[in-house]
């Protein structure tokens, strides 16, 4: 991997991780079209660290508040809306964690293909359009219930299917449940913290147990570039989502998926 490839892939990961457009659909393009080599396990860990740092630092006030309330609910048995939301985020993490443990190998073998990614990019883009068009957009994240959190957790588990988009499917599910676009995005991003932490830890453990050589310069590039691009992406997405809605992302997903299908048909 060259420094240009590391920069480009980290930039792509950072910008697409939190937008409802599927990071896997974008990360397959350099290898499928340009013939770039697989980015490797070590680089996967690096970009996970970068995107995790971005969402934690961006939501640092909320993270500290929720974490403090969560610990307080355990140690002091003090319960409030913040501790309740924290527990619901934990609940929403469980389906994806279990799904990942049970079906990761199956997904890697049978579903990680350009054809699947192209199809899911289009299908879930259309679902996002339909839900956003018909959503009531009335609730904030503190009106979350355990049933709604579990529903969002199941949606997050579905994001294991390449091309679905973790943020895309969870925002779609939250809009379907009547949450505002801002609340749907915030809860989706907060949900991402434990699941990215788990995924990054799993990859880090695999890396530690392997004999893969590590290039610190390339990994540092991955961490820094993915952090900066993800932070910028989160900031502007939350600023613009209420006014522009989901249609730009729907159109983009359909164009991307269709282009990928055409390219696959011709090759």
Curated annotation (Swiss-Prot):
Membrane topology: Multi-pass membrane protein
GO cellular component labels: plasma membrane
Catalytic activity: di-trans,octa-cis-undecaprenyl diphosphate + H2O = di-trans,octa-cis-undecaprenyl phosphate + phosphate + H(+)
The keyword Manganese appears for this protein: no
Ranges that cross the membrane: 1-21, 39-59, 83-103, 111-131, 149-169, 189-209, 218-238, 246-266
Enzyme Commission code: 3.6.1.27
A Pfam family: BacA
Database matches in NCBIfam families: PRK00281.2-4, undec_PP_bacA
Entry-linked InterPro entries: UppP (IPR003824)
GO molecular function annotation: undecaprenyl-diphosphatase activity
Other notes: Bacitracin is thought to be involved in the inhibition of peptidoglycan synthesis by sequestering undecaprenyl diphosphate, thereby reducing the pool of lipid carrier available.
Location of this chain's protein in the cell: Cell inner membrane
Highest taxon of source: Bacteria
Gene, per the UniProt record: uppP
UniProt entry tagged with the keyword Cell inner membrane: yes
Primary site of residence: membrane
Protein name in the entry: Undecaprenyl-diphosphatase
Alphabetical UniProt keywords: Antibiotic resistance, Cell inner membrane, Cell membrane, Cell shape, Cell wall biogenesis/degradation, Hydrolase, Membrane, Peptidoglycan synthesis, Transmembrane, Transmembrane helix
Source organism per UniProt: Aliivibrio fischeri (strain MJ11) (Vibrio fischeri)
Family: Belongs to the UppP family.
Purpose: Catalyzes the dephosphorylation of undecaprenyl diphosphate (UPP). Confers resistance to bacitracin.
Main enzyme class: hydrolase
GO terms for biological process, alphabetical: cell wall organization; peptidoglycan biosynthetic process; regulation of cell shape; response to antibiotic
First and last residue of the signal peptide: none
């Amino acid at each position: 991997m060259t420094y240009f490839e590391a920069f480009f892939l980290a930039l792509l990961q950072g910008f697409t991780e939190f937008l409802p457009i599927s990071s896997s659909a974008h990360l397959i393009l350099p290898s499928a079209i340009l013939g770039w080599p697989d980015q490797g396990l070590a680089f996967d860990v690096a970009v996970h660290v970068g995107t995790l740092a971005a969402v934690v630092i961006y939501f640092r006030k909320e993270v500290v508040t929720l974490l403090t309330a969560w610990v307080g609910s355990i140690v002091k048995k003090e319960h409030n809306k913040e501790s309740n939301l924290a527990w619901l985020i934990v609940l929403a993490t469980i389906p994806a964690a279990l799904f990942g443990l049970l079906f990761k190998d199956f997904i890697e073998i049978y579903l990680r293909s350009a054809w699947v990614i192209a199809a899911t990019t289009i299908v879930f883009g259309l679902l996002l359009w339909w839900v956003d068009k018909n959503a009531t957009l009335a609730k904030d994240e503190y009106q979350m219930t355990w049933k709604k959190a579990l529903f969002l957790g199941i949606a997050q588990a579905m994001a294991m299917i390449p091309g679905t988009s973790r943020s895309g499917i969870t925002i779609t599910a939250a809009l379907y449940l009547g949450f505002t676009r801002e609340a749907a995005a915030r809860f989706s991003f907060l949900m991402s913290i434990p699941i990215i932490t788990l995924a990054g830890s799993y990859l880090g453990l695999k890396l530690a147990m392997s004999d893969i050589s590590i290039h610190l310069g390339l990994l540092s590039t991955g961490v820094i570039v993915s952090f900066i691009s993800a932070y910028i992406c989160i900031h502007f997405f939350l600023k613009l989502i209420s006014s522009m809605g989901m249609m730009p992302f729907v159109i983009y997903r359909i164009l991307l998926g269709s282009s990928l299908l055409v390219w696959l048909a011709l090759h």
